[in-house]
Amino acid sequence: MAYVTWLLAILHVHKALCEETLWDTTVRLSETMTLECVYPLTHNLTQVEWTKNTGTKTVSIAVYNPNHNMHIESNYLHRVHFLNSTVGFRNMSLSFYNASEADIGIYSCLFHAFPNGPWEKKIKVVWSDSFEIAAPSDSYLSAEPGQDVTLTCQLPRTWPVQQVIWEKVQPHQVDILASCNLSQETRYTSKYLRQTRSNCSQGSMKSILIIPNAMAADSGLYRCRSEAITGKNKSFVIRLIITDGGTNKHFILPIVGGLVSLLLVILIIIIFILYNRKRRRQVRIPLKEPRDKQSKVATNCRSPTSPIQSTDDEKEDIYVNYPTFSRRPKPRL
């Protein structure tokens, strides 16, 4: 009995640690990075605070209360500012001046609301290149504004899937839209401002993400990550394109670019063929000139007025004219 209690305690601690290390958004480190934090509900907000988890301790960055002035810690006083601290302070996104590697870590944006209670968003800042480069598209989907868009991801069949995560990938950040633990059939509540829906049922062979009433801002890359308990994972990336009244520049541009590249290759091949033909002709002309000169020399040696005699002329009789002398009788003596 004591062993079972001890095992349950370990599992509880492990679950708590996993929940603590989970973050809602991953942001690429840059000098002027912005950590987005917008409260999505309409409850009465009383206070908001920003903190950073260094791994060993939690450091306070700023605290804002509508009944008091904004308080920013001395270490961050001239390094951060709030983009929108208007009345209601629902958008408390934190922007940095000249951020450096020292700012890498996990940040917490905590809203205190009444009567709903605390609402927290965790943001992880990492050193990385553009996230879109690391997530090339596997499929394309086009839709019109106002439609309910359904993204589908086929799950692996060769190994058991424990968790499925849907993310929206942007160049500067990656947001978790939905997360489902298939073994426990538990869902993750997304802190992303855009509300989405997804399925979460054990034994399902595919995962879907529904984006209601799609708009132009929903265009972009969506990644479906399947993870096993052993750490094995697989990703599937879909590029969603919300058309603007029927024309889609984002979809047309790659096609036009491909056609232009194809025409350019064809033009280069044609120029190469024509160049080779011209070069061959230039090589043949000097070879013909000696033959022409020989024929001209042979022609000049012949008399222009003497025609070529035929074989019949060679067989004709030849007559010679001899002079005739008169025979006078010798005088008789």
UniProtKB/Swiss-Prot annotation:
Membrane-related topology note: Single-pass type I membrane protein
A cellular component annotation (GO) from this entry: external side of plasma membrane
Polar residues bias locations: 296-310
InterPro entries membership: CD226, Ig-like_dom, Ig-like_dom_sf, Ig-like_fold, Ig_sub, Ig_V-set
Phosphoserine PTM positions: 326
Biological process (GO), any one: positive regulation of Fc receptor mediated stimulatory signaling pathway
Keyword Signal attributed: yes
PTM (free text): Phosphorylated. Phosphorylation of Tyr-319 allows GRB2 binding and activation of subsequent signaling.
Residues making up the signal peptide according to the UniProt record: 1-18
Keywords (A to Z) from UniProt: Cell adhesion, Cell membrane, Disulfide bond, Glycoprotein, Immunoglobulin domain, Membrane, Phosphoprotein, Receptor, Repeat, Signal, Transmembrane, Transmembrane helix
Subcellular location: Cell membrane
All residue ranges annotated as the Ig-like C2-type domain in the record: 19-127, 136-237
Residues that bear Phosphotyrosine: 319
GO molecular function: identical protein binding; integrin binding; protein kinase binding; signaling receptor activity
Region entry Disordered, spans: 287-316
Residues annotated as glycosylated: 44, 84, 91, 98, 181, 199, 233
Residues exposed to the Extracellular side: 19-254
PANTHER family: CD226 ANTIGEN (PTHR47011:SF1)
Protein name in UniProt: CD226 antigen
Origin species: Mus musculus
Gene name of the encoded protein: Cd226
